[in-house]
UniProtKB/Swiss-Prot annotation:
GO terms for molecular function: anaphase-promoting complex binding; ubiquitin ligase activator activity. GO terms for biological process: anaphase-promoting complex-dependent catabolic process; mitotic G1 cell size control checkpoint signaling; negative regulation of G1/S transition of mitotic cell cycle; positive regulation of anaphase-promoting complex-dependent catabolic process. The lineage of its organism: Eukaryota, Fungi, Dikarya, Ascomycota, Taphrinomycotina. Residues 43-55, 69-78 have a biased composition (Basic and acidic residues). Changing residue 177 to A: Increased mobility on Western blot. This is WD repeat-containing protein srw1. It comes from Schizosaccharomyces pombe (strain 972 / ATCC 24843). Changing residue 98 to A: Increased mobility on Western blot. The modification Phosphoserine is found at residues 62, 187, 214. Has a role in cell differentiation and cell cycling by negatively regulating cig2 and cdc12-associated cdc2. Down-regulates the level of cdc13, particularly in a nitrogen deprived environment. Regulator of cell cycle G1 phase progression. Prevents onset of mitosis during the pre-Start G1 period. Required for degradation of cdc13 mitotic cyclin B during G1 arrest but not during mitotic exit.
Length: 556
């Protein structure tokens, strides 16, 4: 045996060695497992064996066969088609939101909506609820043409192909720049033609956006004012319940009102009761039995005088402070079911289909008669700020009158049942809400400046009353068949904030406290229920308010 660098190399011909000419160091292998000759280790023993094993690990032998070539890279990239919703697999699973996180989430969503409205002019509510677009969503964003003549820009994400397409087809369907001209400049001649009409329109309409002094657009203002009160809690029970035996269950009557003097008037059969909001004392103002019964009540806007409509068609004015009648006015031939004040003018609607305007300072019983309705007038509401009167009747008609004109300014016939519930918004000019009866079951909101309907809400039950909040941009509705509930609505989103339950029959009557903090509801179950819904912003003093019955006031 020869020695080579401390390794013993066999010289026997029975041991076959495979040599590789490409290696600078030849490695000896024993390919004959049944050979009688074994490798002999020199006298250094185990040390050489360990050194050889380390040397073999450092210089592995070349393989006898070439490795097959593979088309795989050094990283694994999965192949997925475009229909795979990757965002669903990687979306963080949200746990239950704490009150703080919920408010933060609502604030973030509102800010995102506001920012989108300012940048893209989009106020679509669907974006608020789905911040991540799914692969099947088609998103369209358009920028309106400006006066510089730049044409519209349209960015569209196409619907991805189905899962049967291969990865090569996915690359072909990748969104690309549209082939149309992105920036298209008009010639000076065309530009003058296109801008002439716009300039004329701007000059004719002072309400254009370019004349606005607000840092945000009008659409964004509506979004800000329509902030949702999702976390708001409404009372589950009323804070006071009063028995009202004999409270009529007639849909066409108005037998409950809360005056600025903080006194609640309610008619039970032929008697009128006064409940003091300060001392909670109850007083009987008058008993009309047996000659007549009460069909409507309405407090004057300032002062302690109460208007009372009767079944015989007369209208009486009472001083609640002294419980004495000041005057009686005739004019109707049948019962008076609706009353409404506009300063010193009292308007009354009767079953004779007529509306009468009365100046309580003048000796005449009335000075104007409106005859547009074809059936009983059951709803009347003045907008004193704009001198507009809204009337609703059993002929399913809603009419808007300009001051004391004999013909209506607008006549809406969109309801399919009697219109008793009417209320004006104290926060926006010309916004009117109306509600229909059992066959209609809808609340409709109108823009009386344009004569158009803004919203149509299907409530699922008879709408008996509507009343706008003095403190917040919300309105209350009371319902009869089949829900018998009280609902609170947000405007302009017209979303339901909450529901008040407790009455077991139709909620036919509704009134609000003078400070706008509480409401009282009356139902055919002969109960009056008091609810605290709003926070009072200011305190009103009845002693400092002037009355239209003040002798120092002059007749205009």
């Amino acid at each position: 045996m020869d020695e080579f660098d401390g390794f013993t190399r066999p010289t026997s011909s029975n041991s076959s060695a495979n040599r590789n000419s490409n290696n600078s160091m030849n490695r000896v292998e024993n390919n004959n497992s049944n050979s009688d000759s074994a490798n002999t280790v020199d006298s250094r023993g185990d040390a050489h064996t360990r050194m050889r094993q380390g040397f073999e690990k450092s210089f592995p032998s070349s393989p006898n066969k070439k490795r097959p070539r593979t088309n795989e890279g050094d990283r694994f990239i999965p192949s997925r088609d475009a229909s795979t919703e990757l965002w669903t697999g990687f979306t963080k699973v949200e746990g239950p939101l704490t009150p703080v996180k919920k408010k933060q989430s609502v604030a973030d969503r509102n800010f995102t909506t506001l920012l989108r409205s300012e940048l893209f002019g989009s106020n679509d509510e669907t974006f608020n609820n789905s911040p991540i677009a799914t692969p099947n969503t088609t998103i369209g964003v358009s920028t309106p043409r400006t006066d510089s003549g730049i044409d519209d820009i349209e960015l569209t994400q196409r619907t991805p192909p189905s899962s049967s397409h291969t990865s090569s087809s996915i690359l072909q369907n990748t969104p690309v720049t549209p082939s149309r001209k992105i920036f298209h400049y008009l010639s000076p001649r065309d530009r003058n033609k296109s801008s002439y009409g716009k300039k004329a329109q701007y000059q004719d309409n002072p309400n254009r956006t370019i004349y606005s002094l607000s840092p945000v657009r009008s659409i964004t203002k509506d979004l800000i004012s329509a902030s949702r009160l999702e976390g708001r809690e409404l009372p589950s029970i009323p804070y006071r319940v009063l028995d009202a035996p004999g409270l009529a269950g007639d849909f066409y009557l108005n037998l409950l009102d809360w005056g600025q003097c903080n006194m609640l008037a309610v008619a039970l059969a032929s008697r009128v009761y006064l409940w003091s909001g300060i001392s909670s004392e109850v007083t009987v103002m008058h008993n009309f039995y047996p000659t007549d019964t009460v069909t409507s009540l309405r407090w004057v806007q300032r002062g302690t005088h109460l208007a009372v409509g009767t079944h015989n068609g007369s209208v009486e004015i009472w001083d609640a402070a002294t419980c004495k009648k000041t005057r009686t006015m005739s004019g109707h031939t049948e019962r008076v079911g609706a009353l409404s004040w506009n300063d010193h003018v009292l308007s009354s609607g009767g079953r004779d289909n007529h509306i009468l305007h009365r100046d309580v300072r003048a000796p005449e019983h009335y000075f104007r008669v409106l005859t547009a309705h074809r059936q009983e007038v059951c709803g009347l509401e003045w907008n004193s700020n704009e001198n507009l009167l809204a009337s609703g009747g059993n002929d399913n008609a809603l009419m808007v009158w300009d001051k004391f004109e004999e013909k209506p300014l607008y006549s809406f016939h969109n309801h399919i049942a009697a219109v008793k519930a009417i209320t004006w918004s104290p926060h926006q000019r010309g916004i009117l809400a109306s509600g229909g009866g059992t066959a209609d079951r809808t609340i409709k909101l109108w823009n009386t400046q344009r004569g158009s309907m803004l919203h149509n809400i299907d409530t699922g039950s008879q709408v008996c009353n509507l009343l706008w909040s003095k403190q917040t941009n919300e309105f209350i509705s009371t319902h009869g068949f089949m829900e018998n509930e009280v609902a609170l609505w947000n405007y302009p989103s017209v979303s339901r904030v909450g529901t008040l339950k407790g009455h077991t029959d139709r909620v036919l009557y509704l009134a609000m406290s003078p400070n706008g903090e509480n409401i009282v509801t009356g139902a055919a179950d002969e109960t009056l229920r008091f609810w605290k819904l709003f926070d009072s912003k200011s305190k009103h003093s009845a002693s400092t308010m002037s009355s239209p019955f003040d002798p120092t006031m002059k007749i205009r």
